[in-house]
């Protein structure tokens, strides 16, 4: 027996600042501690809400092992002081893990299975390297030529996209400079203050005079990545990293990062029960596969699918958070779909702000939720390419 789907409302959205990896502010901060901070700061936005109603914590993590293993979702929920009745599940769709967690939470509420869920993402690229501590790829990927692309490094896939979509080195560098410019301007204007919960880190250093270890507390309130001095001339001097005659460099690629984001998603029943003000509604989500060797073009397929599911047109979207894994793939997607550049990453993207893999979707969702309200816009989208050849896109409506 079918029943009408109900709406899934986002009532809280918060994140940590994004730290540079592996030598940034969070180099000694465990990922579960970052997750705890994001969860606590999100819950603090709705003090009238009873956390006993949360049924599950769904947390995205791209490399869920070592310090972010042992089901980091459950660990984070417990360490954040949530009731032990709150479950926890860690989900992995590489770079789209965080937005997948949010979509899963929204789906369970829409079909009436749950009334309150926590959706989050976390990643420490300082403590857990991008491929994990002991990567082991199936040898069978070399059995068929169609599967060879699975073995490509992400940078090499970006080179393939740049070549196939004819994205020049100069265009990539120009795009990257603009990412930093927008991020610096946004920081100076206080655009991130609604979404970022400042994080206090304790630094320890030897006191040579006393022979003891001194401590100093430092508050991190802004993302570490943006550089005001970034210039086209400076980026042009960088050597290519992944191909001898390529165009992809460290300067026009996303930064490795540490961070976490969390959102509270509830049903209309809970809204009314606690008289909560909804920040946004999660509208639709889509994932589509593409050849692994050109994984960066994934959003080209996912964006139209998410729009169709929402009954919207491309022009209806006011704010697009397109994860800047690489300038090459971002520009290829923008040009292929004819996206309006003025709507893309208005506060800067991953090239400047950083890309903590599994946390990115949740972090960028928090950016969209608060950004739409601050600028009085209607629809926002979070979209990204995904390693092994996928694209993901989620649409959010301001209420």
Please provide the spans of the model-predicted regions:
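Active-site-proximal alpha-helical scaffold in enzymes
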Residues: 91-123, 162-192, 262-269, 334, ...
């Amino acid at each position: 027996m079918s029943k009408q789907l109900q709406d899934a409302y986002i009532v809280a959205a918060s994140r940590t600042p994004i730290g540079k990896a592996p030598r940034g502010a969070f180099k000694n901060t465990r990922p579960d501690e970052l997750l705890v901070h994001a969860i606590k700061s999100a819950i603090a936005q709705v003090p009238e809400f009873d956390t006993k109603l949360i049924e599950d914590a769904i947390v995205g993590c791209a490399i869920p092992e070592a310090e972010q293993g042992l089901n980091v979702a459950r660990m984070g929920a417990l360490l954040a002081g949530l009731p032990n009745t709150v479950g926890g599940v860690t989900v992995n769709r590489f770079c789209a893990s965080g937005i997948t967690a949010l979509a899963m939470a929204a789906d369970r509420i829409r079909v009436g299975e749950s009334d309150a869920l926590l959706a989050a993402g976390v990643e420490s690229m300082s403590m857990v390297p991008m491929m994990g501590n002991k990567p082991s790829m199936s040898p069978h990927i070399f059995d068929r030529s169609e599967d060879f692309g699975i073995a490509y490094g992400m940078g090499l896939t970006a080179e393939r996209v740049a070549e196939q979509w004819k994205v020049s080195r100069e265009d990539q560098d120009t795009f990257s400079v603009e990412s930093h410019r927008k991020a610096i301007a946004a920081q100076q204007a206080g655009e991130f203050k609604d979404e970022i919960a400042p994080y206090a880190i304790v630094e320890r250093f030897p006191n040579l005079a006393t022979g003891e270890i001194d401590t100093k507390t430092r508050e991190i309130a802004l993302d570490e990545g943006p550089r005001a001095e970034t210039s086209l001339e400076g980026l042009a001097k960088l050597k290519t990293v992944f191909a001898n005659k390529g165009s992809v460099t460290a300067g026009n690629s996303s930064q490795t990062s540490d961070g976490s984001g969390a959102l509270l998603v509830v049903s209309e029943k809970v809204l009314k029960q606690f008289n909560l003000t909804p920040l946004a509604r999660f509208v639709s989500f889509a994932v589509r596969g593409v050849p692994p060797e050109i994984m960066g073009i994934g959003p080209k397929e996912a964006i139209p699918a998410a729009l169709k599911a929402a009954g919207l047109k491309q022009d209806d979207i006011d704010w697009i958070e397109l994860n800047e894994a690489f300038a090459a793939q971002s520009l290829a997607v923008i040009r292929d779909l004819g996206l309006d550049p003025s709507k893309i990453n208005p506060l800067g993207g991953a090239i400047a702000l950083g890309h903590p893999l599994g946390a990115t979707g949740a972090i960028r969702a928090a950016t969209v939720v608060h950004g739409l309200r601050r600028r009085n816009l209607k629809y926002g989208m979070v979209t990204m390419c995904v390693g092994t050849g996928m694209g993901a896109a989620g649409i959010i409506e301001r209420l």
